Amino acid sequence: MKNINRRSFIQKSAFGLAGTMAVASGLVNLSFNPASGAMIDTVQLGETGMKVPRLALGTGSYGWKKTSAQKKIGEEKFVQLAQHAYDRGVRFFETADMYGTHEFVGKAMKKVGRENVTLLTKIMVYEHQDWYKPESFQKSIDRFRKEMNTDYIDILLLHCMVNSEWPDEYKRYMDDFSEAKQKGIIKQVGLSCHDFGAMKIAAENPWADVLLARINYNGAKMDGSPQDVMAVLKKAKDNGKGIIGMKIFGCGDLTKDEQRQKSLEYVIKSGNVDCMTIGMESIAQVDDTIERIMKLANS
């Protein structure tokens, strides 16, 4: 794949207006569980040897053209949000070059201490119309580290793989990832899956340490039915991959209390998803999500 337009990307990654409006009219205005003081626990990320918080602070809700919902709240509010999440155990930040949040994450890590945080970012390796063209891997990784005030990246993913040919199409990048991993610049490598075929290949591919996959009970904004996707994630987990869930709330389609609860329960109780990333924009959302997750994890 050499180019993808905005419409195609939205269809694949589900950063659409409908999802934005669902959140704007739903999740943001719902009542939330009050904070009890519960802390997010840590879990093993597959067989990578890495322990991570069960919940990551996502920074790319409706991310496109170097912006996202988290970027739009502004640097000061984002850093406050990240500090609050950190204080409650969410010491795992998920970002990407496309979201435009690298520098916000860098400011947050400077405040809480880089050594205390797991950092995941993603690199886009194909063109987007006239506004994005991939740099060389070395130029990108140097820029990422500068933007985020870090010497190393815990998890680096190929962003938005949309077909089963990705190991052939992006072998050069995969080799670059592996070389950087050998040098200690990256600790774990993998991909974010936005296609069922891409996910099936990733589950068996020995190169990938980590899979970021869309999963919820409903099938909203997913790459297949919940049953089919969960079967692939089980295979990936059996193969030692670290599995990170995304689109837990269906990119805004599953915002009612009972929907959020059911989706979290489905993912946590499956045993096939190690941890998850959720794009939160307020302290109330952070507290509510932590309360729900930890009650389920401890039940």
Model-derived segments and spans:
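Acidic (Asp/Glu)-rich catalytic clusters
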Residues: 47-49, 106-114, 145-149, 203-206, ...
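Alpha-helical scaffolding within the catalytic cores
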Residues: 38-43, 102-104, 137-144, 195-199, ...
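A short, structured active-site edge motif that brings together acidic residues
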Residues: 116-129, 159
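Active-site mouth loops of central-metabolism enzymes
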Residues: 61-75, 123-135, 254-256
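Active-site groove signature of glycoside hydrolases
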Residues: 148-164
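Beta/alpha (TIM)-barrel catalytic core signal, keyed to glycine-rich beta->alpha loops juxtaposed to Asp/Glu
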Residues: 161-299
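N-terminal binding-site loop/beta-alpha segment at the start of enzyme catalytic domains
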Residues: 2-117, 266, 270
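Short, acidic/polar
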Residues: 70-84, 133-147, 194-201, 259-266
